[in-house]
Amino acid sequence: MADLYTKDWTDVKDKPVARVVFIHGFGEHVNAYPEFFEALNERNIEVYTFDQRGFGHSRKGGPKKQGCTGGWSLVFPDLDYQILRASDTELPLFLWGHSMGGGLALRYGISGTHRHKLAGVIAQAPMLRCHPDTEPNFLLRKALTLVSKVHPNFLFDSDVQSQHITRDEAVNQRLQDDPLVSSVGSLQVFSDMLNRGTKTIELAPQFFLPLLITHGTDDNVTCSDSSKEFYENAGTKDKTYQSYPGFYHSLHIEKKPEVYEYLDKVAAWIYEHSKPSETVKSEQETAVEHPKPTATTSAPSASPTGVPVEEESHKATSDAVPPAEAKPEPVPASAAERAPTSESTTVPETIVASTTKVISEPAPRVTTAATADIVTNK
């Protein structure tokens, strides 16, 4: 396994409720949005992060090696290691992926070696297909696949513009100025990403973990219809799809105060799936246990912060390992003294840690008239 840069955000305000392994998107790195991880810490959620091979501080060889991953076969072993690294706790463990990372999270929930260790999967604007305006046709995809086998590390610019990432102009400018954020990647990573997404949709009936998918309606990078398709076909009976009107691609770094509403909604889902429960064996996947079936239904409702919410979820059976003894804490309103954040470049045998302190805005409770369309089918 290649050396991978890792950074763990464990400075929670009070008692930790859950732990998340976060997978960043294409062309990004985990230090690109520290305020997001700090906001999760404010909600008593620990976060373990890493720069994927070929990106950020895990990139080897400078800009000429941007997005050179070595191939799809190496990605899951990297993720196996990150999940094992984060499993040294009684806290329930969740896998949260954004964009390219969201597609990886869904695929790992289907066939990942350690998926039984997960209490649930959160796929944010997952890369299953490109937005219809940019989705390559069949012939172009076929050509890309063939050429990538001959010249896997040939660099290609996806031409994703920073202004399409979030409505927060200050964040867009910061991403544009960040030398480690780039729209360039290897032909191999593009080919793998597109082909993996198509196959993941086909395999949706084999997904049996608790599932939350979130997508912005104004995302013009990835296809929200594909997210909905995966949700509808997923084998799990514990699944929720949330659609946020007006949100761009990166929901976790959207403009304030709407981003706080978003994080509150996702945190509430994590809290709900962090409660201890009875278990029975799943017929579909005997290696995974799930809580005793329950059935509830709900109509579109308003969120606690007053933002109209349309949410669709279906929750009759949760097919994940029951979470450990962890009780949800209320969403804190302000920051407090915290444990140090650990940052390292890792190999499987060693984790080198140094203390860092991340400064970001606390996540206040929000009262706003903006809409957040979320669909709940229980």
Curated annotation (Swiss-Prot):
The modification Phosphoserine is found at residue 301. Converts monoacylglycerides (MAG) to free fatty acids and glycerol. Has a strong preference for monounsaturated monoglycerides. Required for efficient degradation of MAG, short-lived intermediates of glycerolipid metabolism which may also function as lipid signaling molecules. Controls inactivation of the signaling lipid N-palmitoylethanolamine (PEA). Involved in fatty acid ethyl ester (FAEE) catabolism. FAEEs are non-oxidative metabolites of ethanol that are transiently incorporated into lipid droplets (LDs). It is an enzyme of class 3 (hydrolase). Pathway: Glycerolipid metabolism; triacylglycerol degradation. Belongs to the AB hydrolase superfamily. Monoacylglycerol lipase family. Its EC number is 3.1.1.23. It comes from Schizosaccharomyces pombe (strain 972 / ATCC 24843) (Fission yeast). Keywords: Cytoplasm, Endoplasmic reticulum, Hydrolase, Lipid droplet, Membrane, Mitochondrion, Mitochondrion outer membrane, Phosphoprotein. A motif (GXSXG) lies at residues 97-101. It holds the Pfam family Hydrolase_4. One of its GO terms (molecular function) is monoacylglycerol lipase activity. Gene3D superfamilies: alpha/beta hydrolase (3.40.50.1820). Residues 293-305 have a biased composition (Low complexity). This is Putative monoglyceride lipase. Residues 341-350 have a biased composition (Polar residues). Residues 276-292 have a biased composition (Basic and acidic residues). The keyword Phosphoprotein applies. One of its GO terms (cellular component) is lipid droplet. It is found in: Lipid droplet; Cytoplasm; Endoplasmic reticulum; Mitochondrion outer membrane. It catalyses: Hydrolyzes glycerol monoesters of long-chain fatty acids. Disulfide bonds: none annotated. The active site is at 99 (nucleophile), 219 (charge relay system), 249 (charge relay system). InterPro entries: AB_hydrolase_1, AB_hydrolase_fold, Hydrolase_4, MAG_DAG_Lipase.
